C-alpha cells in the first residue's frame, strides 16, 4: 500500500482493457468473499461496455437508444517492471430518479489493486464520475458497500458520502425470480 500520490492517467476503458478489467473484477469478488459468483466472460463484458452480441442470454449489449449498457473508466498505472498496466477501474451505469426527473450514476464496481491503495486512484475515479455528473446535469452518484468493509466505509466518509441507513436492498434471483415471473400476466 502506498500513500504517495501517483500519476496514473484516467480514461474511458477500451475493448483492449477487458482482460485486465475482468481480472480485477475477479480480484474484487475474491476480496468480497464471492468469487464463486463470478460468471461473466470477456465476451459478455465487452458487450456490456461496447455493444455487440454476447453469447449468453441476459446481457443487454446496448440500451434501447443504442448506448452501451454500462461504462468503465480505468487508471493507467506506470509500472517499471511491467510497463503501463491498469491500476484501478470504475464500472458504472445510468440510473434514474423519478423525484428529480434526472439521471444519476450508479457505481457498480470500484477497485484499486491492493498494492496501489492509498495512491489516490479511487478518489480520482470518483472525482471523474462526479465531474461527469456535474457536466451532464445528473443529480446523484451512488453505490453500495458491504457493511464489513471498514476501509471502504472510512474512505467514502472522507468524500462526504453518507450511508442511506433508512433503505434496505432487496434482490430476487434464481428459482424465486422464475416463480415471480410465472405469476406475471403476459
Regions picked out by a protein language model, each given a short descriptive name:
Residues 43-74, 106:
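A short helix-loop-beta-strand connector motif used in the catalytic cores of GNAT acetyltransferases and
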Residues 85-87, 96-107, 117, 164-165:
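A conserved beta-turn-beta hairpin within the catalytic core of GNAT-like acetyltransferases
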Residues 123, 127, 135, 147-166, ...:
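Conserved active-site alpha-helix within GNAT-family acetyltransferase domains
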Residues 22-58:
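Conserved GNAT-fold acetyl-CoA-binding loop/helix
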Amino acid at each position: 500500500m502506498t500513500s504517495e500520490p501517483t500519476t496514473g492517467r484516467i480514461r474511458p476503458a477500451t475493448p483492449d482493457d477487458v482482460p485486465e478489467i475482468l481480472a480485477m473484477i475477479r480480484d474484487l469478488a475474491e476480496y468480497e468473499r464471492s468469487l464463486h459468483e463470478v460468471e461473466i466472460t470477456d465476451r459478455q463484458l465487452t458487450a456490456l461496455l461496447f455493444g455487440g452480441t454476447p453469447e449468453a442470454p441476459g446481457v443487454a449489449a446496448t440500451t434501447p437508444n443504442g448506448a452501451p449498457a454500462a461504462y468503465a473508466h480505468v487508471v493507467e498505472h506506470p509500472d517499471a517492471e511491467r510497463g503501463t498496466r491498469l491500476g484501478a477501474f470504475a464500472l458504472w451505469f445510468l440510473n434514474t430518479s423519478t423525484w428529480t426527473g434526472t439521471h444519476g450514476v450508479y457505481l457498480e464496481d470500484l477497485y484499486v489493486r491492493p498494492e496501489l491503495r492509498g495512491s489516490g486512484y479511487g478518489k480520482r475515479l470518483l472525482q471523474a464520475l462526479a465531474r461527469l455528473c456535474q457536466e451532464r446535469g445528473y443529480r446523484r452518484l451512488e453505490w453500495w458497500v458491504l457493511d464489513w468493509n471498514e476501509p471502504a466505509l472510512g474512505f467514502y466518509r472522507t468524500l462526504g458520502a453518507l450511508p442511506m441507513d433508512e433503505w434496505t436492498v432487496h434482490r430476487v434471483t434464481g428459482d424465486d425470480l422464475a416463480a415471480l415471473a410465472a405469476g406475471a400476466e403476459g
